[in-house]
């Protein structure tokens, strides 16, 4: 299996924000100023209706992805979008399993797994969300919960696919609440997620997959988050809506040292691949 170095990821989930004119203006401005893709990968996940016009403006430095997709290719599934439809628009990335999809629309680990398998089958690049509730955190069951969530979601996923995927750790209690995880705590949890990937697959596979953090990000805490050695980037919600803030996130990320997989394999004393 061949692996590429892990670059930082700066992703924005716009949720149900921005109309066409606002979105076009954002993409036009940001695409001219974001760092080179070899330094940091920048992604925007807009509403479904914005995909077509925004994909026309995406380039090497800024790409557009879908917030969701269904696992079937066609059929009587009112309100859903198929992976084939996304591909026909030129979409290459898709966000799967966001906690709002779970709490508001009844998605489960099993449906996320089906979507993940379908996305991989159709050569889409999935960003898969995982995260625990406040009750789980307060009961000190975060690691056990995430281990089971990862086991369920990754069932049937081949090891070879991991190098083209992203895991987004988004603690449910931190999404849209203004309560971001302590950077060191987020780093520790992402270390544990990588350990679980090692257990499910291999050390090499866990070194290949990128794991990012999301949850109440801001210009005030972005630097301390991205400085954490185990965190490969961010998935921002509200904080990604302002052009200046998104560019600031990308600029901070570009200053971080790229992680070379080759170097990782030479560091036998480093169990978490950073």
From Swiss-Prot:
A single BP term in Gene Ontology: glycerol catabolic process
Major site of localization recorded for this protein: cytoplasm
EC numbers on record: 5.3.1.1
Top EC class, one word: isomerase
Family annotation (InterPro entries): Aldolase_TIM (IPR013785), TIM_sf (IPR035990), TrioseP_Isoase_bac/euk (IPR022896), Triosephosphate_isomerase (IPR000652), Triosephosphate_isomerase_AS (IPR020861)
Active site: 98, 170
Catalysed reactions, semicolon-separated: D-glyceraldehyde 3-phosphate = dihydroxyacetone phosphate
Positions annotated to bind substrate: 13-15, 176, 216
Any one GO MF annotation of this record: triose-phosphate isomerase activity
Any one annotated GO CC term: cytosol
SUPFAM superfamilies the record matches: Triosephosphate isomerase (TIM)
Statement: the UniProt record of this protein carries the keyword Isomerase: yes
Pathway: Carbohydrate biosynthesis; gluconeogenesis; Carbohydrate degradation; glycolysis; D-glyceraldehyde 3-phosphate from glycerone phosphate: step 1/1
Subcellular location: Cytoplasm
A Pfam family per the record: TIM
Keyword tags: Cytoplasm, Gluconeogenesis, Glycolysis, Isomerase
Signal peptide start-end: none
NCBIfam families: tim
Subunit comment: Homodimer.
HAMAP family for this protein: TIM_B (MF_00147_B)
Function as written in the Swiss-Prot or TrEMBL entry: Involved in the gluconeogenesis. Catalyzes stereospecifically the conversion of dihydroxyacetone phosphate (DHAP) to D-glyceraldehyde-3-phosphate (G3P).
Family: Belongs to the triosephosphate isomerase family.
Name this polypeptide is given: Triosephosphate isomerase
Gene: tpiA
């Amino acid at each position: 299996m061949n692996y590429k170095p892990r670059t930082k990821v700066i992703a924005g989930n716009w949720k149900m924000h921005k109309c066409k004119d606002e979105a076009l203006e954002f993409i036009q401005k940001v695409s001219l100023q974001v760092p080179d893709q070899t330094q940091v990968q920048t992604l925007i996940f807009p509403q479904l209706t914005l995909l077509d016009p925004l994909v026309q403006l995406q380039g090497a430095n800024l790409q557009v992805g879908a917030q969701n997709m269904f696992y079937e290719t066609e059929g009587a599934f009112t309100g859903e979008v198929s992976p084939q439809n996304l591909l026909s628009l030129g979409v290459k990335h898709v966000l799967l399993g966001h906690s709002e999809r779970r709490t508001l629309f009844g998605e489960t680990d099993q449906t996320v797994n089906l979507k993940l398998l379908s996305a991989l089958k159709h050569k889409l690049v999935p960003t898969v969300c995982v995260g625990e509730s406040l009750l789980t955190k307060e009961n000190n069951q975060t690691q056990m919960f995430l281990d089971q969530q990862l086991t369920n979601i990754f069932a049937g996923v081949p090891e070879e696919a991991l190098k083209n995927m992203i895991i987004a750790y988004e603690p449910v209690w931190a999404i849209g609440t203004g309560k971001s995880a302590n950077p060191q705590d987020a780093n520790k949890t992402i270390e544990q997620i990588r350990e679980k990937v090692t257990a499910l697959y291999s050390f090499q596979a866990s070194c290949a997959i990128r794991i990012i953090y999301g949850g109440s990000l801001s210009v005030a805490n972005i630097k301390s988050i991205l400085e954490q050695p185990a965190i490969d980037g961010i998935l921002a919600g509200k904080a990604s809506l302002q052009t200046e803030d998104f560019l600031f996130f990308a600029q901070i990320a570009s200053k971080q040292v790229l992680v070379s997989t080759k170097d990782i394999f030479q560091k036998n004393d480093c169990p978490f691949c950073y």
